[in-house]
Amino acid sequence: EIFMPTEFLHGLYDGGHGAGLYDYWEMMRKHPRCAGGFLWVLADEGVKRVDMNGFIDNCGNYGADGIVGPHHEKEGSYFTIKQVWCPIQIRVDSLDSQFDGKLRIENRYDFLNANTCRFTYKYVQLPSVTDKGGMKVMKQGEVNCPDIPAHGVGTLTIPAAMKGANALLLTVTDKNGNDLFTWSYKLEDIAGLQQVSAGNKPSYRSEERRVGK
């Protein structure tokens, strides 16, 4: 039997699409009989009321459950879904100013080699809370993904952290030129920002039971 839940997360007012998706997906990936799953739903549903000056009527809370809004505006969970389901994953949680340019990456494609993708890197200087200017790009470039077969892991090499940059942006692009995801890493403490602990990650256990046993 193949397990493929038709609605394992519901996004009412963006309260459920991204929340918990990582835990569900990591558990589902470990079971060979799991073929994937469905999120409900892609876009907020509503009727444009001509008698209310174009107001989008969601019939209370029955239709505001999309990954994107009624005008296809991206909601918070949109970016979480892109990250969790990105076929190329960076297996690094944090970096610092001593970053040597090497990153462990995982190819989650079922058939494609990772070398069909490219990475764009940007070393940037983010402004402090009192700065009036915007983000400054200190150095940028492109590199090919290394030769990593489907479901394999390997090392991506980019130039090491440069002096003056306090953050790194990494964007992976597929063979068709589609941006799959952009990661951002803090390299140095940014003036005016307070460090906040992320807390402990949740844990889970899984077991399989046969009906009638």
Predicted stretch roles:
Residues 1-104, 108-116, 120-137:
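Extended substrate-binding grooves/exosites of carbohydrate-active enzymes
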Residues 85-98, 186-204:
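Extracellular ectodomain segments of secreted/surface proteins
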Residues 101-103, 119, 141, 154-156, ...:
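Hydrophobic residues positioned within well-ordered beta-strands of beta-sheet architectures
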Residues 122-124, 128-164:
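Intrinsically disordered, low-complexity Pro/Gly/Ser/Thr-rich segments with frequent PxxP/GP/PP motifs
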Residues 161-200:
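Terminal connector regions
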Residues 166, 205-207:
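Short, compositionally biased segments
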Residues 208-213:
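Conserved small/polar residues in nucleotide/adenosyl-binding loops
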